[in-house]
Every structure is written in structure tokens, then in C-alpha cells.
Amino acid sequence: MKQYLQVTKPGIIFGNLISVIGGFLLASKGSLDVPLFILTMAGVSLVVASGCVFNNYIDRDIDCIMERTKNRALVRGLIAPGVSLWYASALGVAGIALLYWAANPLAALLAVLGFIVYVGVYSLYMKRHSVYGTLVGSLSGAAPPVIGYCAVSGQFDSGALILLAIFSLWQMPHSYAIAIFRFKDYQAANIPVLPVVKGIVVAKHHITLYILAFMVPTLMLFLGGYAGYKYLIVATAVSVWWLGMALSGYKQAVDDSLWARKLFMFSIVTITCLSVMMSVDFQPDATPVLVSMLP
């Protein structure tokens, strides 16, 4: 049974659940519906697990080439490919049905869209054929917090849009950092990620620009009246520090692999801090800060 758990990538599920909690509690505004919270977490977990199993099935030919993925269950033959398809399908159907039944049709629809983008667009085509694969994949990576938010709100409003922007833009430097310190793996598997296709220097430029872009919706969550001043202080601190780490990559004597690994690790710190702060420093009434300042 261990291999059936591993193929769902528990680490990725856990990381996504942190963002789901952030979106859910932000929308809850202090009024927590515990059954809805638990069922939303379960539904998203099942859908993410399904996507990961499908990804393992699709990528088994390149996973055997890459050092970090060569011991995955499907590569080692611990799970038959056909069985993995049935397993992934069952997980996905269960997760989407649970979100539809326990939350609302919008949450289920967002899960379906995120799943289609990740499995159908990113994994099946973009990852192997386009340097823009990471950009497309970032949209699916941003789905969980938006699902958590919409499970409570029942609508895709400006708060949901801001969350989508925050988590999509965060994915880019996070993913490019991985591609830099795993450069040889991606190169050997012929995966056209930006650092391999355009070079590490160009990737550094993109990382810096995406972090700057990421800071805008991060600020908008405060200016839009969704989060408070404590959120603003923490979000600003981690974002500026992350940007500083990115800029340190331009030093001549820098070890690109070590720099990228540190940048990757801090990207996790950054998004975790944001998720925690939006969970605890929400605004009961989302009144835009700029509007509230008017006489």
C-alpha cells in the first residue's frame, strides 16, 4: 500500500492544503464552518492526488531519466500503468463529487478546470513541448487556494482573482529555481524549461520580474480590504527578502545551484507566511483601504 500513497505525492498535497486553508479562512472571516472546512480539504486532497498520479503515469518515460524521479513507483514497476489510471480516475471523481456535494458547484468547477490544465494541457503537452509550460502549469497550481476561498464565498469575486494572481505569480520563480538547481536532470530529459532553453542568466531576469509582479497582488489583498496591517507587514517583509535573495544571484562569484536551492526554500517560507497571515488577519468586511481613507 505504501507505493499507492507515494504515487499521490503527499508532500505536494500537504503544500497545497496550506494554501487551501489560507483561502478558506480568508473567505470565512472568522466564522468557521468546520464540516465544510474538513470536506473541502478532503475534496481538494483527492483531486490533487489524482492529478499527481496521472502525472506519474504520463511522465514515466522521462522519470526514469531524471535522478530525482527514477525511483518512483511506476518507473520501478511497483504499480501497473493500467492500475494507476483506474486509481487516478477514482481519486479525481471522488474529489470533484465531494466538492460539488459538500461545498458548491463553483468549487467543483474550479477543481475540474485546474485538473484539466494540469493533466490535459501541462502534463500531456506543454511540459514537453514549450518553454511556456511553467506559465500554464502555474494556473493549475493556483487553483487550490481559490477553491478554498470559493467553497466559502460561493462566488468568484475580486478576492478570488487576487488569490489566483498571487499563487500563479509565486509559482514562476519557485519553479524556475527548481529548474536551475536540477538543470542537468531537465536537460537530460529534454524538458524545455526556461533555464535550459534560454539560459540561467535569462531565467534570473525572469525570476526577478516575477517576484516584483508577485508583490503587486500581494499588496492588493491588503488594499482591497481583504487582509489587515499585520498581513501587510509580514507579506512585505518576506516579499522584499525574497526579492533581495533573487538579486543576490547576479553576483559574479555566486554558485547558481546553491543560490537557486536557497531561493526555492525561501519561496516556500514566503507562501506559507502569506497563507498563515491571510488566515488570521482577515478583514470582516472587505472595504478597500483607499476607499476607507476618503472623507
UniProtKB/Swiss-Prot annotation:
A GO BP entry: heme O biosynthetic process
Enzyme class: transferase
GO cellular component: plasma membrane
Species of origin: Aeromonas salmonicida (strain A449)
Source taxon at top rank: Bacteria
Transmembrane segments: 7-27, 34-54, 78-98, 106-126, 131-151, 161-181, 207-227, 228-248, 263-283
Purpose of the protein: Converts heme B (protoheme IX) to heme O by substitution of the vinyl group on carbon 2 of heme B porphyrin ring with a hydroxyethyl farnesyl side group.
GO MF: protoheme IX farnesyltransferase activity
InterPro entries (alphabetical): Protohaem_IX_farnesylTrfase, UbiA_prenyltransferase, UbiA_prenylTrfase_CS, UbiA_sf
PROSITE patterns named among the record's database cross-references: UBIA
Keyword Membrane: yes
EC number(s) from the headed UniProt entry: 2.5.1.141
Topology of this chain in the membrane: Multi-pass membrane protein
Protein name stated in the entry: Protoheme IX farnesyltransferase
Annotated family: Belongs to the UbiA prenyltransferase family. Protoheme IX farnesyltransferase subfamily.
HAMAP family: CyoE_CtaB
Keywords in alphabetical order: Cell inner membrane, Cell membrane, Heme biosynthesis, Membrane, Transferase, Transmembrane, Transmembrane helix
Organismal lineage: Bacteria, Pseudomonadati, Pseudomonadota, Gammaproteobacteria, Aeromonadales
Note: Carbon 2 of the heme B porphyrin ring is defined according to the Fischer nomenclature.
Reactions it catalyzes: heme b + (2E,6E)-farnesyl diphosphate + H2O = Fe(II)-heme o + diphosphate
Subcellular location per the Swiss-Prot or TrEMBL entry: Cell inner membrane
Pathway assignment: Porphyrin-containing compound metabolism; heme O biosynthesis; heme O from protoheme: step 1/1
